[in-house]
């Protein structure tokens, strides 16, 4: 169920980035890792439409929601949209019309989260999936350690609320670390890593 693609064997640097501003893309890791996971019980062919939140949530130490929305973030969002379209899904403007919703998050400070079984996750982080007070739920086991400069993508099944506290189900996620830089070459590397996340998720198709 889990897949980990190590793109570089060099150790990742941990850098400090302010969560009050857009990420400083000149100060992030130069080596990257691509990790994906999914709910083995989900039939991804049953989904038809998707919606992507157009800003990237910045997860840091702030108690207020902050979002990354500039040219670089839009290129990252667009890359996920293209991959989902290539997988056969149709984009829709309104989240209420979508079978699945993708939200992207950027880790602005090193964050550690560990779990060994299914359960709610991130349901109290400010601004995270702020949709009608619903929480979010992973039906599969996982253990993560998130580094500064990571991007997390999560697909939510909007039609499958779980019986636990009205949580909606995360059916797929990707974790890509050390991608970003201010020049075109590093953005190309970022696009390659996003492509790799979908390449190692062959089940994610219409």
Question: Where are the regions that the model predicts?
Answer:
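Post-signal peptide N-terminal segment of mature Sec-exported envelope proteins
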Residues: 28-46
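Bacterial lipoprotein signal-peptidase II cleavage site
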Residues: 20-26
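Surface-exposed short loop/turn segments
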Residues: 104-159
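Short secondary-structure boundary motifs at beta->alpha junctions and helix caps
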Residues: 161-197
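Bacterial N-terminal signal peptides that target proteins for export
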Residues: 1-8
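N-terminal segment of the mature soluble domain
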Residues: 55-105
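C-terminal motif of bacterial Sec signal peptides marking the signal peptidase cleavage site
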Residues: 15-18
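Stable alpha-helical elements in mature extracytoplasmic
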Residues: 40, 72, 76, 80, ...
